[in-house]
Amino acid sequence: MEPITHFLTGACMGRAGLNRKTALATLTLTLAAEAPDLDVLGRLRGSAFGFAHHRGFTHSFLGVPLDAVVVVGFVYLIWLLRGRRVKDPNLPPRWELLFFYACLAGLSHILLDFTNNYGVRPFWPFSEKWYSWDIVFIFDPILFSFLLLGLIVPSLFSLIDKEIGARQRGPRGRVAATMALIAVVLLWTLRDFEHRRAVAALQARTYNGADPARASAYPDLDNP
């Protein structure tokens, strides 16, 4: 997926409740959700090198902990530069938990990239095999909208409450972010159904009088 979708996913994970366990959770999850794409720095050594190593080690199960170390180290540096201040003094950073969260966010990146038609190599360097679900284009406006709304809707309601003088009730941010993540899973379910139906339709056809040896269907922006 494109970077903004990954950032939004990490932010929703934090707002869904993980930020209640430790300070700096949402920041860590947001950065870690996009951290595997640091492999784009390989393009500095040339386009061929960058292409060959994209979605390689940083997108593998073996690379997730290393990605997490980089992110948590960066967040730790920010924390130090800010004088070790956090929003809630009663909720200090729990670095071992932040590392775990960073790993979860890294896995979310692999999962999102697995759903599109480019795929991932999660078992690299032990296997160069690519795996892809082929149900989502690299940018899906509906999925993107779910995640974005899950983050901004609570803020809009808060502004309305302040404008009319109403008292805010309940953890709107947590509910909205959780609903956004659930909506993404439901969208995947629908897209999987549509993908299977498209593949079945292709397999049912004959080509020059012969049955297809293999049929595949790939989403794009105009026809997800």
Residue ranges and their predicted role:
Residues 216-224:
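Short periplasmic/luminal acceptor-recognition loop of GT-C membrane glycosyltransferases, typified by
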Residues 1-197, 201-213:
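N-terminal membrane-targeting hydrophobic helices
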